[in-house]
């Protein structure tokens, strides 16, 4: 029997909420937003250098499938929760239901911090690609715009991108679902086109043996620490790329048949992105016929930065039409991604504010006549801009430390937010009110694996990513510091203080509004 809006509204009412957002999204659109936020055309390009410089081909050819499989386990655990509790509050609501008000409060804040960081990192990451494209199409651009200062150029482009994404979310509400649907096919056919170009266009290719065995350490850390420290830092490529899939849960109140569609949207977006991303990355490695140039820090030899995938593509294709073709495909894919990220972030902020958890919640929970949470969208965008300001200071380490710090914040905060309800579901055991889509008895080992993986990556990604970022080390420089632990840890400390001084006296968790 087909589900109706009344079925969805009844399920939402059972959770304590009336229908305020417009429920117009199909199951495919729900999947599409998570697939768009994961965006292999974004993460596989912008954080490729992290894996290349910290591990090399081994971190990609062997690391990607292993980490992607572990993330799929995490996603399956979350799908079960999404089916049981189909509300825009998502992770925060699950934690509140299973672990109480305090668990929900901290989970919600971690989730929000992570979503803001994801939005910011995608918005900032695409600026390098826009900069290069503008430089190839307009002579003199590189030296005239913002006085030729590359750092300022990227930040100005970042501001423009965030403004455009905000305007689309504010006034293009009827187009958002359609945009995400288009984004899916753009990612599928665009990635396929790039793979075909990199297979057939270059005159020479790397060997399969090199692709699966070559090790590279451009991190500055000792080779003795390769396996236990350097290589795991390279896994940030996978862990960052395949994230943001909680968007399917945050869009539950706008999705038809959300108790099944949100669950499927989460795990399918991970599965298909994992497969597609691996094929795309292997094409990059196959085309890497001049690794010495990619490893060079001499701008006369490598104009795109050490470990850059753009350098690989440029060496393989030259700077002509095919190079521009690939750059246009990835750039538009990343722009789709940042718009979807802002949508997801604003919905979570709306839901969290609806329960009174955020300062200014009375304004942030408001929706206009079109069912759009206007204030939540604007504040989400401004918060993303604020945490990216350190990118204006050039790192002495020679890598975009501020960018990778924002990436680390996104990964740590989001995955810790994922971990809390997964652990609480494991603890609940047979008392968990399973929905129609569930894991059965397999939840025991799946939830355990998910928790262990998240704890491990959270430890690694708060560590220094360059020797000059190690406090007390020779040549220490604050611009090389990974400020992910400062933001995440500092935020948690402030939240803990706020909780004990005030919040615990008035915050009641999810508030029924019917």
Predicted regions and their residues:
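Membrane-interface loop-to-helix entry segments
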Residues: 153-212, 243, 266-271, 407-420, ...
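Terminal cytosolic tails of multi-pass membrane transporters
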Residues: 1-27, 422-446, 464-514
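Hydrophobic alpha-helical segments and their helix-loop junctions in multi-pass secondary transporters
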Residues: 128-135, 185-217, 239, 283-288, ...
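Transmembrane helix-boundary motif of multi-pass solute transporters/channels
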Residues: 14-128, 239, 245-248, 326, ...
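Hydrophobic transmembrane alpha-helices that form the core helical bundles
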Residues: 46-53, 62-63, 72-162, 167-170, ...
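TM-loop-TM module centered on a large, flexible mid-protein loop between adjacent transmembrane helices
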Residues: 93, 100, 132-143, 215-222, ...
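Hydrophobic, membrane-embedded alpha-helices of multi-pass small-molecule transporters
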Residues: 29-45, 76, 157-164, 217-287, ...
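Selective recognition of specific alpha-helical transmembrane segments in multi-pass small-molecule
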Residues: 40, 66-73, 119, 187-202, ...
């Amino acid at each position: 029997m087909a589900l109706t809006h009344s079925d969805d509204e009844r399920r939402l009412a059972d959770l304590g909420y009336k229908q305020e957002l417009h429920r117009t999204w199909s199951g495919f659109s729900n999947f599409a937003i998570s697939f768009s936020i994961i965006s292999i055309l974004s993460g596989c390009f912008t954080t490729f250098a992290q894996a290349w410089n910290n591990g090399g081909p081994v971190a990609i050819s062997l690391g990607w499938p292993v980490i992607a499989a572990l993330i799929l386990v995490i996603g399956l655990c979350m799908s079960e929760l999404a089916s049981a509790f189909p509300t825009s509050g998502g992770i925060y609501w699950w934690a509140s239901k299973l672990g109480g008000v305090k668990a929900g409060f901290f989970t919600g804040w971690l989730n929000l911090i992570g979503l803001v960081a994801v939005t910011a990192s995608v918005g900032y990451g695409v600026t390098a690609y826009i900069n290069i494209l503008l430089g190839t199409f307009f002579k003199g651009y590189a030296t005239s715009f913002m006085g030729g200062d590359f750092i300022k150029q990227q930040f100005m482009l970042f501001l423009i991108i965030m403004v455009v994404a905000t305007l689309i979310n504010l006034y293009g509400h009827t187009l958002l679902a359609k945009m995400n649907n288009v984004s899916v096919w753009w990612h599928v056919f665009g990635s396929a086109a790039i793979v075909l170009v990199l297979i057939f266009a270059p005159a020479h290719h790397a060997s399969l043996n090199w692709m699966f065995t070559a090790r590279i350490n451009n991190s500055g850390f000792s080779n003795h620490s390769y396996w236990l420290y350097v290589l795991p830092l390279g896994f940030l490529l996978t862990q960052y790329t395949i994230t943001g899939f909680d968007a399917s849960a945050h869009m539950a109140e706008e999705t038809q048949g959300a108790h099944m569609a949100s669950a499927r949207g989460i795990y399918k977006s991970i599965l298909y992105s994992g497969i597609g991303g691996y094929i795309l990355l292997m094409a990059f490695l196959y085309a890497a016929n001049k690794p010495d140039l990619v490893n060079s820090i001499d701008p006369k030899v490598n104009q795109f930065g050490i470990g850059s995938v753009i350098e690989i593509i440029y060496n393989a294709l030259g700077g002509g039409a095919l190079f521009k073709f690939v750059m246009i495909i990835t750039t538009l894919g990343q722009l789709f991604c940042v718009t979807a990220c802002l949508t997801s972030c604003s919905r979570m902020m709306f839901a969290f504010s609806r329960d009174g958890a955020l300062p200014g919640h009375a304004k942030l929970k408001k929706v206009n006549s079109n069912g759009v949470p206007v204030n939540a969208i604007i504040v989400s965008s401004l918060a993303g801009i604020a945490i990216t300001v350190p990118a204006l200071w050039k790192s002495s380490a020679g890598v975009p430390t501020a960018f990778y710090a924002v990436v680390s914040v996104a990964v740590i905060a989001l995955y810790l937010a994922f971990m809390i309800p997964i652990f609480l579901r494991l603890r609940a055991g047979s008392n968990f009110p399973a929905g129609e889509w569930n894991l059965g008895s397999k939840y025991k080992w799946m939830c355990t694996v998910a928790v262990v993986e998240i704890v491990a990556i959270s430890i690694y990604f708060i560590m220094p990513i360059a020797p000059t970022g190690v406090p007390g080390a020779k040549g220490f420089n604050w611009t090389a510091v990974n400020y992910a632990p400062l933001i995440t840890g500092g935020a948690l400390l402030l939240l803990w203080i706020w909780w004990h001084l005030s919040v615990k006296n008035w915050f009641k968790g999810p508030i029924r509004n019917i």
